């Protein structure tokens, strides 16, 4: 399968065009066709010579994704299941917000982080997505707007789908530079958030990139014992290493870090844990924010359940009394396969059942 041209940054596309005997402005024209006019075929690029179009077609495809499923929620959330060229499946989510249209993208096929509450890790990592496959997710949603004649654009991006973004670092960075490019989609860096489960060394590397993209950290527990029991990654990057990297990030970028904290009933949602969390984040309080996330139950992880509203409220109150900037996250798509990885997992189960039935 040819690589997607979406996998190139504008500078890389210019270099490729020059290597193929073209002037730099040809690459700029192609970039405009891809991201401003958003064509679906190289043949639609009417100001590109037939000879150069032939080279383009021999070298690249445009969009490598095929839509398998689209579930639309009553609140306007759309959950997509896309098929990759090798037949593997990934999820992408469109969330309609009061401030714009936000898309959550996937960076890996499966996940090896091993969080015990998460649907994404039910199927182990099979491979990284390349940068073109990540960018194509944004283009699929933008095409959805365009085809409906909706004067809307993808304005915000969260890199929080299946997989650990910092375990696919270079492809994610290429993706970020592509969607942020002022000559293309021009999605503002401050409208983009990358979430990590806590790869401390990559947080430091990210701090040195000089990008204005937001950082979120999946914390989910305020002490090492509990965090190691629900997030295997903590055994490699315990809280002292993680927070050292976070402090370095804040000192280097002067940017706020968001902590994601999923509320698991009688696991991590007690008043003691709330106080521990307040104490843990005290040193970086001015440049940190806690996002309390209602749990979407996963049948394979039935040892966990959603925290009742009164426990969430008590937890929230303790954080606020300690001066912690925090919010209970607004839910999206609760009437569809809401948990990250759930649509993919359920579809793969159905595919296996169909295959088994066909054999009998």
Swiss-Prot record:
UniProt cross-references to InterPro entries, sorted A to Z: Aldolase_TIM, Methyltransferase_A, RlmN_N, RNA_MTrfase_RlmN, rRNA_lsu_MTrfase_RlmN/Cfr, rSAM
Subcellular location: Cytoplasm
Active site (UniProt): 91, 340
Cofactor(s) the protein requires to work: [4Fe-4S] cluster
GO (cellular component) term, any one: cytoplasm
Presence of the UniProt keyword Cell inner membrane in the record: no
Keyword Methyltransferase: yes
Domain of life, per lineage: Bacteria
UniProt-listed SUPFAM superfamilies: Radical SAM enzymes
Comment on bound cofactor: Binds 1 [4Fe-4S] cluster. The cluster is coordinated with 3 cysteines and an exchangeable S-adenosyl-L-methionine.
Catalytic reactions of this protein: adenosine(2503) in 23S rRNA + 2 reduced [2Fe-2S]-[ferredoxin] + 2 S-adenosyl-L-methionine = 2-methyladenosine(2503) in 23S rRNA + 5'-deoxyadenosine + L-methionine + 2 oxidized [2Fe-2S]-[ferredoxin] + S-adenosyl-L-homocysteine; adenosine(37) in tRNA + 2 reduced [2Fe-2S]-[ferredoxin] + 2 S-adenosyl-L-methionine = 2-methyladenosine(37) in tRNA + 5'-deoxyadenosine + L-methionine + 2 oxidized [2Fe-2S]-[ferredoxin] + S-adenosyl-L-homocysteine
UniProtKB keywords: 4Fe-4S, Cytoplasm, Disulfide bond, Iron, Iron-sulfur, Metal-binding, Methyltransferase, rRNA processing, S-adenosyl-L-methionine, Transferase, tRNA processing
An example Gene Ontology biological process: tRNA methylation
Domain Radical SAM core: 97-335
Binding site for S-adenosyl-L-methionine: 163-164, 195, 218-220, 296
Cysteines engaged in disulfide bonds, as pairs: 104-340
Any one GO molecular-function label of the UniProt entry: tRNA binding
Binding site for [4Fe-4S] cluster: 111, 115, 118
EC number: 2.1.1.192
Sequence similarity: Belongs to the radical SAM superfamily. RlmN family.
Main function: Specifically methylates position 2 of adenine 2503 in 23S rRNA and position 2 of adenine 37 in tRNAs.
Miscellaneous comment in the UniProt entry for this protein: Reaction proceeds by a ping-pong mechanism involving intermediate methylation of a conserved cysteine residue.
HAMAP family associated with the record: RNA_methyltr_RlmN
Protein name: Probable dual-specificity RNA methyltransferase RlmN
Source organism of the structure: Streptococcus equi subsp. zooepidemicus (strain H70)
């Amino acid at each position: 399968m040819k690589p997607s041209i979406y996998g190139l940054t504008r500078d890389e596309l210019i270099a490729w065009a020059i290597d193929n005997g073209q002037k730099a402005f040809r690459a700029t024209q192609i970039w405009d066709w891809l991201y401003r006019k958003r064509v679906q075929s190289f043949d639609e690029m009417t100001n590109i010579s037939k000879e150069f179009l032939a080279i383009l077609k021999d070298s690249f495809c445009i969009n490598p994704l095929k839509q398998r499923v689209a579930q639309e929620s009553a609140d306007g959330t759309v959950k997509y299941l896309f098929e990759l060229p090798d037949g593997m499946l990934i999820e992408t989510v469109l969330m309609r917000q009061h401030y714009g249209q936000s898309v959550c993208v996937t960076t890996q096929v499966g996940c090896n982080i091993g969080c015990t509450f998460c649907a994404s890790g039910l199927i182990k990592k099979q491979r990284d997505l390349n940068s073109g496959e990540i960018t194509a997710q944004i283009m699929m949603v933008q095409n959805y707007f365009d085809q409906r004649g909706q004067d809307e654009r993808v304005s915000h991006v969260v890199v929080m789908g299946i997989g650990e973004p910092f375990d696919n670092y270079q492809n994610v960075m290429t993706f970020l530079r592509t969607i942020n490019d002022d000559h293309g989609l021009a999605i503002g860096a401050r409208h983009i958030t990358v979430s990590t489960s806590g790869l401390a060394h990559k947080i430091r590397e990210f701090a040195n990139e000089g990008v204005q993209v937001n950082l979120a950290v999946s914390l989910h527990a305020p002490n090492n014992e509990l965090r190691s029991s629900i997030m295997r990654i903590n055994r490699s990057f315990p809280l002292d290493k993680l927070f050292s990297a976070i402090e370095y990030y804040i000192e280097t970028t002067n940017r706020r870090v968001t902590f994601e904290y999923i509320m698991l009933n009688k696991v991590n949602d007690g008043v003691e844990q709330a106080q521990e969390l307040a104490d843990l984040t005290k040193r970086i309080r001015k440049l940190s924010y806690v996002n309390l996330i209602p749990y979407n139950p996963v049948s394979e992880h039935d040892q966990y359940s959603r925290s009742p509203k009164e426990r969430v409220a008590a937890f929230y109150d303790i954080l606020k009394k300690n001066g912690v900037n925090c919010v209970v996250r607004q839910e999206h798509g609760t009437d569809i396969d809401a948990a990250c990885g759930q649509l993919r997992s359920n579809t793969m189960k159905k595919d296996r059942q169909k295959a088994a039935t066909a054999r009998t």
